[in-house]
Amino acid sequence: MQVSVQGNDVDKALRLLKRKLQTEGFFKEIKKRKHYEKPSVKKKRKQMEAERKRRKAQRFRKPDRD
């Protein structure tokens, strides 16, 4: 990944890089790979994430009009 530094503004370029990495899920992936996760634990975590996603989607879904 590349971020160009314009006008010697390194801080701005660093913030831009961090934002890009955040949107790609880089930091989340690093946290997941820090320690080994057993397949059973991984399966359970994925199920919980999917359930959480379903609940969140249901909360923000527009009610059907009959």
Swiss-Prot record:
> Which intervals of the chain form a coiled coil?
none
Region listing for Disordered, in residue ranges: 34-66
Protein keywords = Ribonucleoprotein, Ribosomal protein
CC annotations in GO: ribonucleoprotein complex; ribosome
**What is an annotated GO biological process for this record, any one?**
translation
Reply yes or no: does the keyword ATP-binding apply.
no
Q: Where is the composition biased (Basic residues)?
A: 34-46
Keyword Ribosomal protein in record: yes
Q: A GO molecular function for this record?
A: structural constituent of ribosome
Q: In which family does this protein belong, per the annotation?
A: Belongs to the bacterial ribosomal protein bS21 family.
Q: What is this protein called?
A: Small ribosomal subunit protein bS21A
Q: Which species is listed as the source?
A: Geobacter sulfurreducens (strain ATCC 51573 / DSM 12127 / PCA)
Q: Which gene encodes it?
A: rpsU1
